[in-house]
UniProtKB/Swiss-Prot annotation:
Subcellular localization(s) per the UniProt record: Cell membrane
GO CC annotations on file: plasma membrane
Highest classification ranks of the organism: Bacteria, Pseudomonadati, Pseudomonadota, Gammaproteobacteria, Chromatiales
Keyword Electron transport appears in the UniProt entry: no
Protein name according to UniProt: UPF0391 membrane protein Tgr7_2500
Length: 52
């Protein structure tokens, strides 16, 4: 249990430093772009209608 607590502490520290720098904004923008790309691919595949 102590090992897991230390791992989560390290992950929380890394996430905190990335959140307070400027990396979080860039990661959010990349996530939005990827969401739109995969949403477009979903719509195209649904409209294509070919079953595999």
């Amino acid at each position: 249990m102590l090992g897991w607590a230390l791992i989560f502490l390290i992950v929380a520290i890394i996430a905190g430093t990335l959140g307070f720098s400027g990396v979080a904004g860039a990661a959010s923008w990349i996530a939005q772009v990827l969401f739109l790309v995969f949403l477009a691919l979903l719509v195209i595949s649904l409209l294509g209608g070919r079953r595999v």
